[in-house]
Amino acid sequence: MERSHLAVLLGLLAFAAGVPAAAAATAVEGAQAATAEASCEPSILATQVSLFCAPDMPTAQCCEPVVASVDLGGGVPCLCRVAAEPQLIISGLNATHLLTLYAACGGLRPGGARLAAACEGPAPPASIVTAPPPPVAFRRKPPAREAPPPPPAAEKLSPPPQQHDDSDHNKRVGPLPRGSPPPYAQSVPVGPAAAPPPPRSGASSSLQAPLAATTTIVAITLIAAAQY
């Protein structure tokens, strides 16, 4: 029983001694991170990198700011801040280029691809652009046909003229006196009609022609005899 109590006491003492040590270690790491973050100057480091660095060209002047941004500036977060500066964006350098240069310069932290992925972070979801629906075309209703207004009372059609009978006309004119011709009768000449001339017979006309020829011959003969 006494041994078990002693074991429990020793465990409690060891736990009590380990908690302050862990807390102290955490505090030291936090202080180091704060110091490293304070020592990271992304604008100055980005200016130096843009002046002296080019992709796949790890010169001595280029390696100094690149290695300092990772080893002395707080690790990958500082390098990501340097890569986000406008100087490097204009120069065409990104975090992948810087980590490649860091590995070529002999940096203390390996795994450039993993560090570059940490800089880039998860890709944002692609925004889906939805086009607005087309406007609904409203159909215009044709205007209703209005009935023509009724004609006024003054413009009513007059009744057709009535046809008068001849009997009514005769009644109005009155009876004609005796001996007078009717108004519409044609004038007929009074007296006997002249007799047509008698037609000439065909025999007399046929005799007159030879008689005239004979008379002409006799006259010519007499004239010739008188001359001799």
UniProtKB/Swiss-Prot annotation:
It is found in: Cell membrane. It comes from the Eukaryota. GO terms for cellular component: plasma membrane; side of membrane. Glycans are attached at N94. Expressed in young panicles. Specifically expressed in pollen mother cells and young microspores. It is a lipid-anchor; GPI-anchor. The keyword Transport does not apply. It holds the Pfam family LTP_2. Residues 124-207 are annotated as: Disordered. Disruption phenotype: Abnormal exine pattern of pollen grains and complete male sterility. Belongs to the plant LTP family. This is Non-specific lipid-transfer protein EPAD1. It comes from Oryza sativa subsp. japonica.
